[in-house]
């Protein structure tokens, strides 16, 4: 069985306990990915609760990736909250991010990448409000389940002894595989996504989206919690996903294997985040690279070159963090 309302050359599969099951979702009407993932995570914590050595729990929720599916009670919390539109929400978020110190005076709000909200019809605005309500409901369910997980960690007496990292892999995406246009987002029968306007608002104040190497595609949230080690606050030091493994090895004393399945490994590229967690200045990466399809970028210090299948562009991210002034054209 393929995806609902979508023609594919291959079938989609899901698996539980190493058993591959055909079909795009569970036949259980009460099944929801985020809930199920958390159930299994809690079971794993119970399984390893008596271990003396450190453990790592990797919990990769699929939410809020499309398709937009959420429980009705979660959707109801957010219905109507997005009718002011993506333009005003971008402005509000930009203002609040400045007030919170998340961004600074050099950050400029990039031009809108979508149709103006005021140009939509009343029905279109209603439809867009529902899309974002479902998207928010999916994130709400993530929050609920993280609460369940954290409660379990506390019950095991490991809260003060645990480093918790919460992050996402990329910026919001503009993809539009809305293959069930006659079915509103929310139920399992639908296959809908958020619009470009909402993806643009999600990436405030940066340019572009997922699948590009502009800041809107690669600059993502990273939250770390470790009682007694990490003090509340924010840092502007640059990190990368490759640093996570290096950090875990630094904390636990684990060694990177020289061979895996008989094959020699290459030296890992990540740098431990532990100095940053301790409030210290970490020696930065000499350079960081990104590549996805036709998108490429290299960052050295504050300078970044980036392209999307065309000519290279150059930006000074300290003076121009939202990539508004292409120095290659100067």
Task: Give residue ranges: language-model regions.
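C-terminal cap/loop subdomain of S1 sulfatases and analogous C-terminal strand-loop tails that border
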Residues: 1, 187-215, 229-319
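Formylglycine-dependent
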Residues: 1-75, 79, 84, 98, ...
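Outer-membrane beta-barrel transmembrane strands
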Residues: 37, 134-149
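Secretory-pathway/luminal and periplasmic proteins that interact with or process carbohydrate-rich
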Residues: 51, 64-70, 171-178, 279-285
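Histidine-centered active-site microenvironments of extracellular/periplasmic hydrolases
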Residues: 1, 69-70, 151-226
């Amino acid at each position: 069985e393929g995806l609902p309302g979508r023609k594919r050359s291959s079938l989609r599969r899901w698996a539980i306990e190493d058993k591959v099951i055909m079909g795009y979702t569970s036949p259980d009407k009460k099944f929801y990915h985020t809930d199920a993932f958390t159930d299994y995570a809690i079971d794993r914590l119970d399984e390893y609760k008596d271990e003396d050595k450190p453990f790592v729990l990797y919990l990769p929720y699929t939410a809020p990736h499309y398709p937009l599916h959420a429980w009705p009670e979660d959707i109801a919390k957010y219905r109507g909250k997005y009718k002011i539109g993506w333009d005003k929400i971008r402005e509000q978020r930009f203002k609040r991010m400045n007030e919170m110190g998340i961004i600074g005076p050099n950050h400029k709000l990039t031009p809108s990448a979508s149709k103006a909200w005021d140009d939509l019809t009343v029905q279109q605005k209603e439809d867009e409000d529902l899309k974002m309500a479902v998207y928010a409901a999916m994130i709400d369910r993530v929050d609920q389940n993280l609460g369940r997980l954290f409660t379990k960690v506390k019950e095991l007496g490991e809260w003060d002894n645990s480093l918790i990292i919460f992050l996402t892999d990329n910026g919001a995406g503009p993809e539009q595989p809305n293959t069930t246009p006659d079915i509103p987002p929310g139920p399992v029968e639908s296959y809908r996504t958020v619009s470009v306007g909402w993806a643009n608002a999600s990436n405030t104040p940066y340019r572009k989206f997922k699948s590009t190497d502009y800041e809107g595609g690669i600059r993502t949230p990273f939250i770390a919690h470790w009682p007694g080690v990490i003090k509340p606050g924010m840092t502007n030091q640059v990190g990368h996903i490759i640093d996570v493994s290096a950090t875990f090895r630094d904390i636990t004393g684990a060694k990177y294997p020289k061979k895996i399945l008989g094959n020699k490994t290459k030296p890992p590229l990540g740098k431990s985040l532990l100095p940053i967690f301790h409030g210290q200045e970490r020696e930065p990466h000499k350079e960081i690279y990104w590549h996805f399809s036709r998108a490429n970028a290299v960052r050295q210090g504050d300078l970044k070159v980036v392209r999307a299948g065309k000519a290279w562009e150059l930006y000074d991210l300290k003076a121009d963090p939202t990539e508004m002034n292409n120095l290659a054209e100067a």
